[in-house]
Design a protein with these regions (language model features):
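Conserved beta-strand hairpin/beta-sheet module of binuclear metal-dependent hydrolase folds
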Residues: 30-78, 184-198
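Metallo-beta-lactamase
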Residues: 20-21, 25-27, 32, 120-175, ...
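Sec/Tat-exported extracytoplasmic proteins
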Residues: 83-87, 107-110, 114-117, 122, ...
Length: 201
């Protein structure tokens, strides 16, 4: 009997993973995991990343702001609840649309920082991936509506960069190729928290 229950649990989990739930970042669900780091969890919803928010005394860093403008706007609202910072940086673990196109929901003065290899991925394949994702379901197509390109980075780095947010430093490390050519991880030094994206699933 317990084997049947176990099998049913597996089938239920598989069905849930395949369900056409809209890829929406859940507002009001942000929680603190360390002194400077907050996470909006993916809630096991397909096409929703675990969004990271790192808050310093001078600036806020957002990691993987989700898919499309509306999700990006939701992430920005959550980030603004955590501090009075007006300076925002946006980084992505890789260029896939469910991680990177939420940049569109941030104001123009928010600064995007990318590894050169990730920028190359975007220039060569970015919109092709957006179109591919949009063709998968009406919900994803609606989420990506209005995405006609990726934001231009304020800064591009080759292998490594350290970002000082005020009282907390974040190391940006390009580790790809792995999941993609431009895979980048973000290590919050004081908190010893690592954002690895789809390199670790």
């Amino acid at each position: 009997m317990r084997y049947v229950v176990f099998l049913l649990c597996i089938l239920s989990f598989h069905a849930a993973a395949q369900s056409p739930a809209p890829p929406v970042v859940k507002e009001g669900n942000t929680f603190k995991i360390s002194q400077h780091v907050y996470v909006i969890p993916d809630e096991l919803v397909p096409m929703v990343p675990n969004v990271g928010i790192v808050v310093g005394t001078k600036a806020t860093l957002v990691v993987d702001p989700g898919m499309g403008r509306r999700n990006g706007e939701a992430v920005l609202r959550e980030a603004k609840k955590l501090s009075r910072n007006t300076e925002f940086y946006i980084v992505n673990t890789h260029f896939h649309p469910e991680h990177a196109t939420g940049e569109a929901g941030f104001p123009p003065e928010a600064k995007v920082i990318r590894a050169a290899a990730q920028q190359q991925d975007i220039e060569e394949m970015g919109m092709q991936w957006v179109q591919n994702f949009a063709s998968r379901s009406p919900g994803i197509a609606e989420t990506l509506q209005g995405i006609t390109g990726f934001r231009k980075p304020a800064e591009v780095f080759e292998k490594e960069k350290t970002l000082d947010l005020g009282g907390v430093r974040v190391r940006l490390l390009r580790l790809g190729p792995g999941h993609t050519r431009g895979d980048t991880v973000f290590f919050v030094e004081q908190d010893r928290v690592l954002f690895s994206g789809d390199l670790a699933m």
